[in-house]
Amino acid sequence: MSQDFYLGNPNLKKVGTEIQFTKDQIAEYLKCKEDPVYFAMTYIKIISLDEGIVPFKMWDFQQELIESFHENRFNIAKLPRQTGKSTTCVSYLLHYILFNDNVNVGILANKLSTARDLLGRLQLAYEQLPMWLQQGIVVYNKGSMELENGSKILAASTSASAVRGMSFNIIFLDEFAFIPNHIAEQFFSSVYPTITSGTSTKVIIISTPNGMNHFYKLWVDAQKGRNGYAWNEVHWSKVPGRDAKWKETTIANTSERQFTQEFECEFLGSVDTLITASKLRVLTYDDAITTNGSLDVYENPIPNHDYIICVDVSRGLAQDYSAFVVIDITHAPWRLVAKYRDKDVRLYPYILLLVSMVHV
């Protein structure tokens, strides 16, 4: 029977293998296709540190996450450490490539090794599926996987070059808050348009907070309805076995600040910032009323108002950014009314002169 297996692996079905389905299997297949939560609870298996390979016994919040992924195009979730978030996401991605033909999924993380580890978890779960639920294997390695139904899944780092030119039906971004701001910005500018061009494509962003960065902005915008992301958050106490005693022990073994960020999921600013994190969190920001390239304008110039422009220029060699902000100082509190940020302009860009003529 080894001829029915992919490269002799008895846990993987070979392309072209015929399966004689029973009536019960057909009904079960259709049930799994329609309900990703049922599929995960019934057929996904994971590795337990104590018991080896065991069924994935989902907690309520994990079921809610999968339902949100299934029902919404754009998802962002803020979760504590060690809540099974990776296994939950992998379960949904496996369901997606199994029951949808000719789709591409990208598993992306701040490190290539992390993305490949996630793909490895998906492959482990795949090998535990019964043969009648599997698709035949076309490609199966540490970095990618392709099924007989034409669906593919790729593990890569979140660099613009890693996935440039590719099209994805789902992009899963793991621990997005730990990706440097400039890399996240480049990544979205190169890959995000391919997602938004579709009508059923999805973005899933999962992370524990790591300061007040790009993930923080996406999260706040989602909560305030400024973007199209459905948002989910999980408190550490929702994980069985985590109580006040567990919290006390964890803080004793780490620190109060570490617990607050990694388990309470608070967005903490750096201790070295000029403005305190508590103040940064209460500051408001609005969408620009006009945008022209790298220039965002939040208020049009008002006659007889006083403005200042703060400028920080670079060499214009596509490395550091040239930037300036325009601030209305007529009345307290002062307001930022325009900003500019670009790394491809020459020293003392002409746009600075134009903005100065309007506001000063």
PLM segments and residue spans:
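ASCE P-loop NTPase helicase motor core
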Residues: L124-Q128, Q134, F178-T254
